[in-house]
Amino acid sequence: MSIKLINIGFGNIVSANRLVAIVSPESAPIKRIIQEARDRGMLIDATYGRRTRAVIITDSDHVILSAVQPETVAHRLSSKDEVNIDEVDE
């Protein structure tokens, strides 16, 4: 099994296998999702104090904020330059 990792900016990396959605933060429903995740303690802020440009939602209900454009994250997801970690069966 292969684990695909995606750079979401500033050296932060997430597992591509866990991503459900990559969305823009401007709409009211997404702002509500961010606030609810913050209240539940499920928000991960990877913006380093910069403007949030992408909101990444994972299958574990974590919400990750990134300063990278959603299109850039999606391009990295489909790119062949991903970092792959192969699990070795022992």
Swiss-Prot record:
One Pfam annotation reads RemA-like
Q: Which InterPro entries match?
A: RemA-like
* Family in the record: Belongs to the RemA family.
Protein's name according to its UniProt entry: Putative regulatory protein NT01CX_2250
* Lineage start: Bacteria, Bacillati, Bacillota, Clostridia, Eubacteriales
